[in-house]
Amino acid sequence: MGLHSELKLAVPWGHIALKVWGSQKNPPVLCLHGWLDNANSFDRLIPLLPQDFCYMAMDFGGHGLSSHYNPGLPYYQQNFVSEVRRVATAFKWNQFTLLGHSFGGCVGGTFACMFPEMVDKLILLDSTPFFLDSNEMENILTYRRRNIEHTLQVEASQKKSLRAVSPEEMLQGFLNNNSHLDKDCGELILQRGTTKVDAGLVLNRDRRISWPENSFDFVSKEMFVHSAKSLQASVLMIKALQGYYDVRRANDADKAPMHFMVDTLRSTLKERFQFVEVPGNHYIHMNKPQVVAGVVGPFLQGLQRMTSARL
């Protein structure tokens, strides 16, 4: 399944860009990338998955090849959840599978709770908890304020042209900010995340998008427990042992929120929940796609039933 096609889905602010592998007559699997990534992050994984599905990897608004939001409209997690619904409506999907990495898992998980009848399987690849870490309680208003101020600051400077840099400088800067990616994976994401101009490369992403905690729809633990009860999907959660455990990297050493999430899903979904730990870092699906495919493939086909495992 090495070949793919490109689609553009019209939306009120422009278009959502998608990469498609396989026949659209097959059961759909919608793939959601992580924060500031794009659909290319699934290029290494999808060719290794069962070929009797149609895989669509979308670029969230303001990412990759998708349109930026209209001026004045900030980026919040709820907006991305709405984009998933737009894609499902456009392709007339009554039910489909969601596969999300990192922040994409949070978006997919939120969608599966809001529209439980539409999601038959939910796959979370090193996704962070959907709820508010108690350590962040005093910071939540700061994040909201920071998002507004950042948006206003970017809008005030929009008349300035984007700074173009050489491909080498672009890659090095990207890798400096993404220590879990190697050179090849970094180049793969930048292929879709940059545009070539006379002076070099410029980033495609909307500069209004800042740190994920500024746009994350934090909910309480109580709300998360309540939302989990609405899930109708079978859920596979793959945790990279050297991956991320919190939306904010500063809290990564505290694994209690992740354990709470796993325990809640396990006690709520029972046999519909599978938890698998794999060796690797946050970009395990890019760095070691064969490891992830070995877990995701059987789950998609309903061939493997496990409640907990470590590979």
From Swiss-Prot:
Induction statement: Induced by passive stretch of skeletal muscle.
Name recorded for this polypeptide: Serine hydrolase-like protein
InterPro entries on file: AB_hydrolase_1, AB_hydrolase_fold, AB_hydrolase_sf
Primary location: cytoplasm
One Pfam family it belongs to: Abhydrolase_1
Enzyme Commission code: 3.1.-.-
Superkingdom to which the source organism belongs: Eukaryota
Keyword line: Cytoplasm, Hydrolase, Peroxisome, Phosphoprotein
Signal peptide start and end residues: none
GO molecular function: hydrolase activity
Gene3D superfamilies per the UniProt record, alphabetical: alpha/beta hydrolase
Localisation: Cytoplasm, Perinuclear region; Peroxisome
Taxonomic path: Eukaryota, Metazoa, Chordata, Craniata, Vertebrata
Residues where Phosphoserine is found: 210
Keyword Plastid: no
Active site positions, chain numbering: 102
Protein role: Probable serine hydrolase. May be related to cell muscle hypertrophy.
Domain AB hydrolase-1: 27-227
GO cellular component, one term: perinuclear region of cytoplasm
Expression tissues: Ubiquitous. High protein expression in skeletal and cardiac muscle.
Gene name for this UniProt entry: Serhl
